[in-house]
Swiss-Prot record:
Keyword annotations of the record: Heme, Iron, Lipid metabolism, Membrane, Metal-binding, Monooxygenase, Oxidoreductase
Residues that bind heme: C437
Protein topology in the membrane: Peripheral membrane protein
Coiled coil stretches, renumbered: none
Name this polypeptide is given: Aromatase 1
GO CC annotation terms, alphabetical: endoplasmic reticulum; membrane
Cellular localisation: Membrane
Catalysed transformations (reactions): testosterone + 3 reduced [NADPH--hemoprotein reductase] + 3 O2 = 17beta-estradiol + formate + 3 oxidized [NADPH--hemoprotein reductase] + 4 H2O + 4 H(+); androst-4-ene-3,17-dione + 3 reduced [NADPH--hemoprotein reductase] + 3 O2 = estrone + formate + 3 oxidized [NADPH--hemoprotein reductase] + 4 H2O + 4 H(+)
The EC number(s) this enzyme carries: 1.14.14.14
Domain of life: Eukaryota
Amino acid sequence: MVLEMLNPMHYKVTSMVSEVVPFASIAVLLLTGFLLLVWNYKNTSSIPGPGYFLGIGPLISYLRFLWMGIGSACNYYNKTYGEFIRVWIGGEETLIISKSSSVFHVMKHSHYTSRFGSKPGLQFIGMHEKGIIFNNNPVLWKAVRTYFMKALSGPGLVRMVTVCADSITKHLDKLEEVRNDLGYVDVLTLMRRIMLDTSNNLFLGIPLDEKAIVCKIQGYFDAWQALLLKPDIFFKIPWLYRKYEKSVKDLKEDMEILIEKKRRRIFTAEKLEDCMDFATELILAEKRGELTKENVNQCILEMLIAAPDTMSVTVFFMLFLIAKHPQVEEELMKEIQTVVGERDIRNDDMQKLEVVENFIYESMRYQPVVDLVMRKALEDDVIDGYPVKKGTNIILNIGRMHRLEFFPKPNEFTLENFAKNVPYRYFQPFGFGPRACAGKYIAMVMMKVTLVILLRRFQVQTPQDRCVEKMQKKNDLSLHPDETSGLLEMIFIPRNSDKCFTK
């Protein structure tokens, strides 16, 4: 009787087991397959870097970039894993390279002319398939690059000396506008206004409010830097991006007003030759249907923000280095007096200012502003023996590269590092190849003119022996001083007087 009662239970248990086993088997098989996939994924890559570990590795590396900033994260990973390593940004494989042979390979080949970044982020700031800086559409990028190259060479390069010299002189004559109560000069603001004024006179030619535009350029740059790598979900939560939206809108609205004034001037001019410049060329291309209005506006915006964004900080660092190294200042002044003397600086002086040029190069090597380059592989390739798949993101850590190879004293600031010719594969402050900086030649002229005119009039000092080495900095898309920390002002002492330039 008992056996008969238990018999149905036996059949029920057997039935349950027979149903559960297939599901358990499937789960075990899926788990095994997933683990095999993870195991194989980790071992298919011969490139050093953090492990994948069930997707946790990519998440951690992405969060590190968002938290530390691009430049700081790159330096961390290169120091930890080597000079050619693999991480992930937004789930995409990304190579960080600070080895000169690999950097040279990437820069010289045309299948690395695209950059990478968050599509919604680039759309947000107006750079997605527009302008030149982060335009990742190779066809559209080539189309606008022609206009930039024309404006930044030839007649534009020749005019730069006079235009820049006039702007510097004008701003130094009203230095009180950028001095505080102690008489210390806000050098960053001074340089940003000079660079904006020079760029405007060369490329747009419409009067503007320097003070207001400089502030808005900084807001735009902060938004660009903050949004470049943000995940898509960030742009679905308005309160997260609202402050950046305002910064972008403020600058773009001002630029649109200025460009509309330029359009009216062009179309009402009796002689078109009287207003031919970069902006005019673009507006005429728009009229011919070759470029959209949005693309034209973005190109002009980028041309005007480029120098105030990077070159102003570069010169700022140079002046701090001069203040700390009086023997370098002495060498510079000796050459300036020999080549230029008391007359106005001319175009033919540029090639003769060799010490000034070496100083500029050493400053950009020792304390760079743009110390990384972002690219994307447009086809499969092999770099120094490592396979690189199409679509792989690449960051060239040139700031670190400049301290690793060739230079006799890589960790010191000294003109000895450029006493001999440096092969360009070891020193790339402007890049080279098909996507090299379009403004590298005009930038050198601009920096030489700025240094010559400023140093002829003033000796520069820093309060309390401040220096670039101890300065707080932020290393993200570019390397800037932390302006919230203060202590960035300098003392300008007129060379024709022993009296300190204070109130």
